[in-house]
Design a protein with these regions (language model features):
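Conserved protein kinase catalytic core
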Residues: 36, 126, 138
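Short, Lys/Arg- and Gly-enriched loop/turn segments at beta-strand edges
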Residues: 123-129
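Short alpha-helical
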Residues: 7-8, 124
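His/Asp/Glu-enriched, well-ordered alpha-helical/loop segment
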Residues: 1-5, 12, 16-119
Length: 139
């Protein structure tokens, strides 16, 4: 599921999360190379893409991809009314399991990589990021 609030209507996401349940929802970013870039026109691999208001569109108005990331999508899910635990699982252990990588990533457990993003409990902003147990980013 792409949970940028553009690809899929938030009401449809709420229904989907309710039907699929806590362990079957998987969120992906579908981010393209224009992700994080300001509004403008971009040539991405010979394809013209217009970024307007954070949305990537082809010149005919077709969605060209997403300009969001999983952190933004997690915050979106919470704002759409998805329970926190279900939202977190949809961007961590569930995709890791579907990719066959749950033995290494997706949750914190002995023997797994110590990768984690620590969020502010009130705002869900990133406080710091751990990769393999080392802090690689601190807000």
């Amino acid at each position: 599921l792409i949970c940028d609030g553009f690809h899929i209507n938030p009401a449809v996401l709420r229904i989907t999360f309710r039907i699929l349940g806590e362990d079957r929802t998987v969120v992906v970013s579908d981010s393209m190379r224009a992700a994080g870039q300001p509004d403008g026109d971009y040539d991405l691999g010979g394809q013209m893409v217009q970024v307007r208001g954070g949305h990537a569109l082809l010149p005919d108005g077709t969605i060209a991809g997403s300009t969001t990331n999983l952190h933004e999508e997690l915050k979106n899910l919470i704002s759409f009314g998805i329970p926190f635990r279900q939202a977190v699982k949809s961007v961590t252990i569930n995709p890791a399991r579907e990719a066959g990588a749950a033995d290494r990533v997706g949750s914190l457990a002995p023997g797994k990589l110590a990768d984690a993003v620590v969020l502010d409990a009130a705002t869900y902003d990133i406080r710091f990021v751990l990769m393999n147990g080392s802090v690689v980013y601190r807000a």
